[in-house]
Each structure stands twice: as structure tokens, then as C-alpha cells.
A protein has these predicted regions:
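Short linear sequence motif anchored by a di-proline
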Residues: 2-247
Length: 247
């Protein structure tokens, strides 16, 4: 059993009003490079990518954005957006999600929505359903047949005001959420904005294209099942976390 030591917050369930703060990425580097059409993939600094089964806020995740030449580039960023104008980097803990309904107007997100979209690489996520006054049951949600998808994301960069210009900047991302579809609604009142492969270019395109993609993913193209409560501990990082359990 492999456990990952993390400085992420100990989140035992999920954030109120947001999607639950956990997702998975089982893609190997070769699969990711082929799927996202990454150029020169085998000399990339994150080509040693390993499968992850319990991404949590404030941890590093892989996103794909457009580089200076308009080519897709994968980048490791911290989950939890820190706007470039923020006084410190603590804001990220409360900004793992951005509501699709207000993302174009909110000061923390509107600049990123206009100019810094990204695809958050994932192949599944966890949500917690209330089953009693104090008890929640985790579920794993994914696309049927493991059809490729990405979360709609935004990214930004931050550097302390007193830091020298040559100090590396902190790059962070957030995941957009929207109203739940029929599959997700009994489990949670929000769901991530999920982009099928045909929508990736649009999300990385114009603002109008992004606005047209702020919708719930079709329930009939998804599936879910209950999983064990070990996923509630961010240090647990083993493959059996996504296995179905009886309830």
C-alpha cells in the first residue's frame, strides 16, 4: 500500500457549496501525450508522470494550456487559484472551484476566464453524499467506457511583491463547477464542468467558445459507484480507492 505524505489540508469530506475536492488521473505519460497531442513529449520535464488516485487541493496536478506558439503544453500547477494581484498565496485554499454562473464577472476569476483557460487532466472524481445527520458516503464518478475528458480549468500566476523578478512564479489553477446532471444531483448539488475531447479546442479558444461550454455533462455518458471511506484521507493514494464497495 502506497501512501503519499502531503501538506494538503486534511479534508475529510468536501467543501460546502463546491464540488468535492478530490479527483484521479490514471493516465501514463505516453497516454497523456498522445491524447492531448503534446509535441516533443518525451523530453518534457514531467514525463515521469505516475497515476494518481486521490488528488487533493493544494497539491500539484497536471493541466494543459496553450504555449506561446499556440501549441498545447502540459504543466504541473498547484490546485487552488491564487490571483496575480493577491497579497499572499493563502487564497488558493478557498479557490479550488469557480462557479460557471459567475466566473466571467468575479474579480478573482474574470481575467483568467478571458485569457488563461486550461484543461485539467483527470479521468474521474469523488463526491460525498449525505446518508445521515453526520455521515457521508463517497462515490467515484467517471465517464462510461473511460471516454477521455478534462475538467474546464483556469490558471493564473503569482509572485510576492517583494520578490525579485527572477524568482520562479507560482502557477495555480481552479476547476469550474456547474449545476449537477441527473446522475450527480442525488449525490451533490454541484458538479465539475466536464469537457469531452471534442470540446478541448473550444475551451482553449475564444471567450465566446468557453461560455458556450459552461454546461452540465450528459448524465447518460457517465457512471458512478460507491467507494470506501479511505479516500477521505489525502494521504491514501492507492488504486483500490476507486473500487466499488457494497453499501
Amino acid at each position: 500500500m502506497i501512501k503519499r505524505t502531503s501538506r494538503a489540508f486534511e479534508i475529510s469530506s468536501c467543501y460546502d457549496g463546491a464540488m468535492c475536492g478530490r479527483f484521479t488521473n490514471q493516465y501514463t505519460w505516453r497516454e497523456l501525450a498522445d491524447l492531448y497531442r503534446i509535441t516533443e513529449p518525451y523530453i518534457h520535464p514531467i514525463s515521469n508522470l505516475e497515476p494518481r488516485f486521490n488528488f487533493a487541493p493544494m497539491q500539484g496536478g497536471v493541466v494543459v494550456r496553450l504555449g506561446k506558439e499556440g501549441r498545447r503544453e502540459p504543466v504541473m500547477m498547484r490546485w487552488g487559484l491564487v490571483p496575480s494581484w493577491s497579497k499572499d498565496d493563502k487564497a488558493g485554499a478557498a479557490m479550488i472551484n469557480a462557479k460557471a454562473e459567475t466566473v466571467a464577472e468575479k474579480p478573482a476569476y474574470r481575467a483568467a476566464f478571458k485569457a488563461r483557460p486550461c484543461l485539467v487532466v483527470a479521468d474521474g472524481f469523488y463526491e460525498w453524499a449525505k446518508v445521515g445527520p453526520k455521515e457521508k458516503q463517497p462515490y467515484f464518478l467517471t465517464t462510461k467506457g473511460r471516454a477521455p475528458f478534462a475538467f474546464a480549468g483556469l490558471w493564473d500566476w503569482w509572485r510576492a511583491q517583494e520578490a525579485p523578478n527572477d524568482e520562479p512564479r507560482l502557477e495555480t489553477f481552479t476547476i469550474l463547477t456547474t449545476e449537477p446532471n441527473a446522475l450527480c444531483a442525488p449525490i451533490h448539488n454541484r458538479m465539475p464542468v466536464i469537457l469531452g475531447r471534442d470540446d478541448w479546442s473550444g475551451w482553449l479558444g475564444t471567450v465566446d467558445e468557453r461560455k458556450s461550454l459552461l454546461r452540465s455533462f450528459p448524465a447518460e455518458r457517465m457512471e458512478c459507484w460507491p467507494v470506501g471511506k479511505a479516500v477521505g484521507n489525502v494521504r491514501n493514494e492507492e488504486a483500490p480507492l476507486i473500487e466499488r464497495v457494497a453499501i
